[in-house]
Structure formats: structure tokens, C-alpha cells
Amino acid sequence: MPHVRPDPAPSASAQPPAPAPAASTARPPVPTAPPATAARLPIAVDVVALTVADGALRVLLVDRLLEPYAGRPALPGGFLLDGEDVAGAAVRELTEETGVAPRGHLEQLRTYGPVGRDPRGPVLSVAHLLFSPVLDLPRAGGDAAAVRWAPVGPFLEGGAHLAFDHDRILADGVERARAKIEYSPLATAFCPEEFTIAELRRVYEAVWGTRLDPRNFHRKATRSEGFLQATGRVRSEGVGRPAALFRRPPGSGPTAAVLQPPLLRPGSDAPSSGARRVTGADRAAPS
């Protein structure tokens, strides 16, 4: 029988294999102060102020007095001052440049930039949207050479252009208005305190750019829950019987309720019965 030697005992100097290094879970240090670039990024406000007049949706525009884009039309706006909030800056710039006191519904539209929108460098703009029921006569001030209410059609259709990226901001503001009046009472923000159904219909026609059937619109508007409240008064509008006057229900703002059912705009490809697209001649013609 062969002799089997036992395995040699391990040397006292032998070390066990070192464990694999654990993956690092340490987070990079968090900066305690804003980066230097934050102090160099100007913040501006721009205002899309809309109203309805002469059967057309109009926007308040200024002609720029200074470069860049001197002499070009633009939306009212300017830079945020130290300690100023963006809504306050929007009201201040609108009043300074146009003399128009913001009346109606003002809301934040969206933020634009900062790269590529201003030839002077990166600028972040917080755009606001104003729905005005009163066509105040504007008066140029600040760095505005002139100011006017202009139909939105030429700018939306590409026949005219605004300074900076204001074509895009205007288009976004108009689309916001078109969408919101389907589901909210926002169209009443363009109306006086008391209005007829015909006046309200003309607001929808101007904002949507579409002719609506008067009877269908009257039926839908008066049956939409929480939309209108009859005042019990009437107003004569020429030939025919006087028209009933309506208002928003007391305590309800222009966006406080959701219309049930909504007043949906006709599709651009397949207009509903009694609706047709408005042409340039329609926009130029008084209501």
C-alpha cells in the first residue's frame, strides 16, 4: 500500500486574498452657491395682450426705438428688475411702453430661451398672456417708438414678422386662447360686464377665425352649465326684438369653471354645419 503524504500546513506568513474594492457610493460635492453663469443670464418678460375689435382678434404691438431690431414691431416687454416678480414686471412693462393698464385676465404663458432668441446673448423670457375686454387707446412710452393694436392674421400667416422670437410667442398665445375658450368661460374676458349672445359669438368667431351658426351657438352657449347667467335685462340691437343680456355667474372668474358640455371649435379640414373659415377680407371688414 503506497504511503500518502498529507498536504503541507499553510505558512503562517500566507495572507488570504484581498476582497474586491467596493463600488464608491460617494456623491460629488453639491455646490452651495449658484454657478457664475446664473448671474450673467438676464430674465425678461414679454406680453401677448389680445382683444377683439371690428370682428378681428388683435394684439398690442410696439415699434422698437432701440437696437436690436430698431423700428421693427415687437411684443411689449423688457428686463426684470432687482426684487421684482415676473407678473409685476409684465404689468410694469406693458404700462410703461403702451400706456395700457392691464384689465381682464392675465396669466403666464410659458418660458422661452435662453439661447438664440436675442442677438445680444442668452436671454430667458417669461411670456404672459392678457385677455382685454376694453380696446384702450395705447400711448407709446419707454423704449417704444410707436404702439398700436394690430390684427394677428398677418403674423400668424407669415405675411409680417415680429422682432426676436415674438412670432413664436404670439402664435403660442393665440393657440392658448383658442384652446381655452373651448373648455372655460375665458371668452367672457373679452366682453363687457354685460353682453349679448351675439357679442359673445363674435368673440369666438374672432379668436377661432371661423364663422359660426348663430342659432347653434346660442343653443350651445346657453345650455353649457355654469357658463352664463341671464340678467333679466335686454338691449336693442337694431331691427328685431331686443336681445337678452348675460354675464358671468357672480364669483366665477374667466377660468374658474369647466364648460359642460364644452364649446368645441370647428375642425379646419371639416367645418361643422353653418361654419366657414374667415378670409382676409372678413378680417378687414367691420362686424
List where the protein language model places each region:
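NUDIX/MutT-family hydrolases
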Residues: 6-9, 127-130, 138-181, 190-198, ...
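Core subunits and conserved enzymes of cellular information-processing
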Residues: 1-10, 52-62, 87-98, 245, ...
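Short histidine-centered catalytic/ligand-binding loop motif
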Residues: 75-83, 189-190
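Short helix-coil junctions and helix-kink-helix linkers
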Residues: 202-211
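Acidic, metal-coordinating catalytic segment for phosphate/diphosphate chemistry
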Residues: 2-13, 24-46
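Long, intrinsically disordered, low-complexity Ser/Thr/Pro-rich regulatory/activation regions
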Residues: 230-287
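N-terminal strand-loop-strand
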Residues: 35-74, 87
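Active-site segment of metal-dependent pyrophosphate-handling enzymes
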Residues: 41-45, 58, 87-91, 95-154, ...
